[in-house]
Amino acid sequence: MPTLKTLLLVFDLCGTFVFALSGALAAVRRRLDLFGVLVLAFAAANSGGIVRDLLIGATPPAAIADWRYGAVATVAGLLTFWWAPLIEKLKNPVRMFDAAGLALFAVAGAQKALSFGLDPVMSALLGMLTGIGGGMARDLLLTDIPMVLRADLYAVAALLGAIIVVCGDALGLPMAVVAVLGATACFVLRMLALRRGWQLPTARGARKS
């Protein structure tokens, strides 16, 4: 079985890659240049993890201290810049990659918070924050309303994945199994919400701008 440190690194780097793809592809769609694509890739890939590490006192943040995070984001950005037409053939690629990154980071964030001694409630909330941070940074840099502030199930999916991790830890279940279950639950809920139009309620009588 992998150690907690190894598992966190794997989930962090995988989440970094898929979130970088979502950021880079969103940048390509806005016709940003190569530098802009790489900036969006890095911001989407690492913002959530940097915020997580700063909040729990893991300094310097892993995304800054470990060259692999920047390298993974750069590779994802370059791949997207040169092969965007191939990636666009997937159905809703930005949202699919975003859902995958959301799931991986929510799980990794909750696990790292637990490893730093945070209580279960705060660990679950920090896992959610880790998951939504990259998408928020991407959307804000593109002057979009962040997905997490819209009605669709975004933060809720991240929170579900983080809660599964926290509960699994409390029950003493194998961390690898719990991580996979949490990430899968988050990803499935997010994709189902997109496919079926599941949304949180909005204020009655609110006008669309």
Residue map of PLM features:
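Structural signature of hydrophobic alpha-helical transmembrane segments
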Residues: 3-16, 42, 61-75, 119-131
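Short, structured motif recognition centered on aromatic/hydrophobic residues
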Residues: 39-43, 50-56, 125, 129, ...
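Helix-coil boundary and interhelical linker segments in multi-pass alpha-helical membrane proteins
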Residues: 1-7, 54-64, 108-122, 167-178
